[in-house]
Amino acid sequence: MNCCWQVVEPCYKSALSYLCVKVGNICMLKENLVLLKSAFDELKAEKEDVVNRVNAGELKGGQRLAIVATWLSQVEIIEENTKQLMDVASARDASSQNASAVRRRLSTSGCWFSTCNLGEKVFKKLTEVKSLSGKDFQEVTEQPPPPVVEVRLCQQTVGLDTTLEKTWESLRKDENRMLGIFGMGGVGKTTLLTLINNKFVEVSDDYDVVIWVESSKDADVGKIQDAIGERLHICDNNWSTYSRGKKASEISRVLRDMKPRFVLLLDDLWEDVSLTAIGIPVLGKKYKVVFTTRSKDVCSVMRANEDIEVQCLSENDAWDLFDMKVHCDGLNEISDIAKKIVAKCCGLPLALEVIRKTMASKSTVIQWRRALDTLESYRSEMKGTEKGIFQVLKLSYDYLKTKNAKCFLYCALFPKAYYIKQDELVEYWIGEGFIDEKDGRERAKDRGYEIIDNLVGAGLLLESNKKVYMHDMIRDMALWIVSEFRDGERYVVKTDAGLSQLPDVTDWTTVTKMSLFNNEIKNIPDDPEFPDQTNLVTLFLQNNRLVDIVGKFFLVMSTLVVLDLSWNFQITELPKGISALVSLRLLNLSGTSIKHLPEGLGVLSKLIHLNLESTSNLRSVGLISELQKLQVLRFYGSAAALDCCLLKILEQLKGLQLLTVTVNNDSVLEEFLGSTRLAGMTQGIYLEGLKVSFAAIGTLSSLHKLEMVNCDITESGTEWEGKRRDQYSPSTSSSEITPSNPWFKDLSAVVINSCIHLKDLTWLMYAANLESLSVESSPKMTELINKEKAQGVGVDPFQELQVLRLHYLKELGSIYGSQVSFPKLKLNKVDIENCPNLHQRPL
């Protein structure tokens, strides 16, 4: 008997255990269903939170983590299965309750097995749901690695194929860690380096990152480090406070920890640079450095493994490049002269391009012969040298009118590769007196834009997105012209030079223009070498670290016409000696911390342009009442807001033609909008803490930039009545505006911050030229453009938009109900943060 029991016992216990589990599942079915529903609801809420975090991260360009993607996929599967199971349980329960007692007795056996099966499934699903819950992901997305290669635009080339092939072959050799590319300015070194950069796309799997850094004659290690840091995505909020040593450590740490295979492309080195000081580890098999320079000596000092010279074009290639654009073949005599002119360009692509543009409009033999005579008059011993090239390039300058020539040389005051806003450049020219404003400022600006077109057409300026810049060789040529040919005029240009004090000047009386743009100058003390009087006309000191300007610095500058002190954040006051600047026409104090205008400002009777924008500590601008010739006044974003007293002063300035303002009082805004003259000349307005309608703002016909902070923005204009009733209907709404309406036609930049009742910005449909939009901390905004309000308008919004910033808009669900194209918006100009309901990125 015992033997039999020993055989049966394991089976008995197993069956009993199985039966207990089955009975337990039946007995616990209702309780487990309740637990399953509760756990399922918690899992769904957890999933929703994770999805919102993922969407927010992806809107900022992040990629969801693989572990998060797997978890979401598992949750979606179990979500569907659990829903089906709970539906079955609900249906069974309902069927059981509706069945008769007889039917329940007849189906007891089948019901028992069905209940047992259901109970088992519910218990199993409950276990699965619990296993997926409570993951508590610290991070759900990560920033994708930077693209291996940032492709750069490159113009059509002639004669570089052989050099490109040779350079590429050398670069691909393991033993070549560093290559130096040398050649004279304008020969095509940057173009070659650009082609090399783009060629890495073909072998992107071999490298992790290709870094392009543009150097310059005055560039320092810090600026190179900044460019590398940006490319490696390690420039956080503290980066700007780091010393060069700290930056080098960070760069080195990232490169060593990541162990990337990287290529560093340094364009336009003028002297040797310590790679160790930058933070580049000892070059190994995975590292490559390629640099360009005008000097072969730099290649030697940098210890390049191989030096590659970019030579000038052959005679045939030079003619192909020139004739490709000018087409001289049909005119035999002109063609013969053109070939001689091409020969004078020494095969230099830049010279060929500039001369080609200069001669493109010349159609007679006399004009072409005159150009050749000019080139042949230059000293032959200069041929093939940098100055010899300047002489050739100067032909284009010689064809300029006197006014245009002055405007061209002025551009050399800005840093190398600096993109100058065209409207700002024209304002400088007007301030200098290069352009006569007697027919009004708008006519003067039109003439300024015409000059820019002429300089671009002559190949002396390059154009990009309403900005212009100079090729570094053209800039060098401009500075050479000033030093060699402009009698009695001398430029001192030390931009991006790391200066901590004023440069040494042998004779201040010979200097007419000085540019110390982008340096580290903190103080301008008394200098015994200052003469009793200088002849300085232009002084650029913007973007330094100035704290004090003391002594007789201003007292000896009665000839100064343009003074730019902008973006010196630590300047809190200016000396009374500013009253000595009796010739001053343009004064830029934007971005400074001045608390009040200097007492001597009122005597500057020739001042026509005063810029006080972004002066957050300035309390009053009342002194401007004495500036009767003032044409331009800017105090957008200034603490010195418009008040009734200042409004009367502005009305009395009869010469005023351009205005940007700050307003933080409702009644002042109403009175301001009631002034047809002032409202009509306003190009920028900063509104804070106001109740305002877009219809009222729409009457500012010249508005370019608009910022509203903590404003209650409405669509109708019923709150604005009185003086301007004839110019807009107080009840105007967005549905009544047509695309032909002039409102917002010039509006290019809009900033909205902390407007808590704002739901949409449909009125931006009519800002056809909007380029930049920033919206932040407006919790009720659900969409940028309301589809219903926009119906029938027939306008595609955001066609010119280039910058989009959306922050802390928790209810924002869409940009626009319909699909919107953003033809000019680039991914790196989209900044979206904390918009959890915005599931579709603009691009």
From Swiss-Prot:
LRR repeat residue numbers: 510-531, 535-556, 559-581, 583-604, 606-628
Function: Probable disease resistance protein.
Organism, as annotated: Arabidopsis thaliana
Entry text on domains: The LRR repeats probably act as specificity determinant of pathogen recognition.
Entries under PROSITE patterns matching the protein: LRR
Coiled coil ranges: 28-58
UniProt record similarity statement: Belongs to the disease resistance NB-LRR family.
Key words, A-Z: ATP-binding, Coiled coil, Leucine-rich repeat, Nucleotide-binding, Plant defense, Repeat
GO biological process: defense response
Protein's UniProt keywords contain Membrane: no
Superkingdom of source: Eukaryota
InterPro entries listed in its UniProt record: Apaf_helical, Leu-rich_rpt, LRR_dom_sf, LRR_R13L4/SHOC2-like, NB-ARC, P-loop_NTPase, Plant_NBS-LRR
Organism phylogeny: Eukaryota, Viridiplantae, Streptophyta, Embryophyta, Tracheophyta
Name of the protein in question: Probable disease resistance protein At5g47250
Example GO molecular function: ADP binding
Keyword Metal-binding on entry: no
CDD domains in alphabetical order: Ras_like_GTPase (cd00882)
UniProt-annotated binding residues for ATP: G183, M184, G185, G186, V187, G188, K189, T190
GO cellular component: cytosol; mitochondrion
